[in-house]
Amino acid sequence: MCRNITELRGLEPPATHEEIDAAAMQFVRKVSGITKPNAEVAALMHEAAHQIAHITADLLAQVPPRRQPPVTVPPLRRPEVRERMGLAPFPG
């Protein structure tokens, strides 16, 4: 649970809903300190992540563009991470 929160502003192509949702869930896990919730807590965490993702998407749509892209590639754009997670290749 020591991962850094992924920086999404300034990506080309822009951050996907999948990336925003993953970052929101990562944030919820980090601030709650819960990595393996029971069903009741999992539902609460998913609702919180959904709300955070919506707010984050609005924020990213409104902030001014960056002068330079982030220095690291977000995990969900790395082929080895997507393969490990069983996700399709990143479309870009």
Model feature map: region roles:
Residues 1-92:
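A charge-rich, low-complexity, intrinsically flexible signal that marks solvent-exposed coils, linkers
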